[in-house]
């Protein structure tokens, strides 16, 4: 009987040690990696459009910073944007607007410096459920956004990028959408006189919806 108790005690001790030193599964896999965010840049007269593709398996909070510099390398403006819910496998665009003078004219810039950081988002991503249709009319581009999710959302943002016939960016803007309720839609438009040219191509990115 004493031998049996000793064997049971030894077995329990082994089980406790194995449990204590066994690695916790899944924790490392859920931590997003900055290396899985691919970034591309397109500079134009009024600023820089930066696109981000999240190749992580979870939504991330993206904090992006961009500094504009003049010909001497002096920083003339610093911009910061936060995307609280960049969904897994989603591609978004952030428009960093160049600084303007007291008359509202864009201050010329020569170069820029960009940096970003990420963390796991605390929100659930519904950006795939926001659909936008576009209609390039004679004097304006008309858009209709609709929430096809079954949730009441609180934050929705889109970036719209306009290109000329060569593919160069001629204008960009970010819009906050208010189609928060299920099946709710929102109509909005962009006048071509803001662009100074009729665009040949329009790209729409849903930056976040949560």
Language-model region placement:
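Bacterial N-terminal signal peptides that target proteins for export
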Residues: 1-11
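Bacterial N-terminal signal peptides
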Residues: 10-19
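Sec-dependent signal peptide cleavage junction
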Residues: 18-32
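Terminal connector regions
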Residues: 32-35, 43, 98-140, 189-210
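Asparagine-centered strand-capping/turn motif at beta-strand->loop junctions
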Residues: 52-56, 145-150
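Short acidic/proline- and small/hydrophobic-mixed sequence motifs that coincide with surface turns
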Residues: 57-62, 76, 150-155, 169-170
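Beta-strand signatures of extracellular beta-sandwich domains
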Residues: 63-69, 157-163
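Intrinsically disordered, low-complexity Pro/Gly/Ser/Thr-rich segments with frequent PxxP/GP/PP motifs
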Residues: 74-103, 170-196
């Amino acid at each position: 009987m004493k031998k049996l108790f000793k064997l049971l005690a030894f077995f329990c001790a082994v089980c406790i040690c194995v449990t204590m030193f066994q690695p916790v599964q899944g924790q490392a896999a859920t931590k997003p990696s900055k290396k899985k965010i691919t970034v591309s840049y397109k500079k134009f007269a009024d600023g820089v459009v930066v696109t981000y593709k999240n190749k992580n398996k979870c939504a991330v909070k993206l904090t992006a910073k961009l500094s504009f510099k003049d010909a001497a390398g002096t920083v003339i403006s610093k911009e910061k944007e936060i995307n609280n819910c960049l969904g897994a496998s989603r591609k978004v665009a952030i428009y960093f607007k160049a600084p303007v003078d007291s008359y509202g004219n864009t201050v010329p810039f020569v170069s820029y410096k960009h940096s970003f950081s990420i963390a796991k988002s605390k929100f659930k991503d519904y950006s795939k459920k926001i659909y936008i249709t576009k209609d390039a009319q004679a004097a304006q581009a008309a858009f209709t956004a609709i929430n096809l999710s079954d949730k009441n959302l609180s934050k929705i943002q889109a970036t719209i990028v306009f290109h000329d016939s060569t593919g160069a960016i001629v204008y960009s803007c970010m819009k906050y959408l208010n189609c928060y309720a299920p099946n709710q839609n929102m109509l909005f438009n962009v006048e071509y006189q803001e662009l100074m040219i009729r665009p040949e191509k329009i790209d729409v990115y849903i930056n976040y919806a949560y």
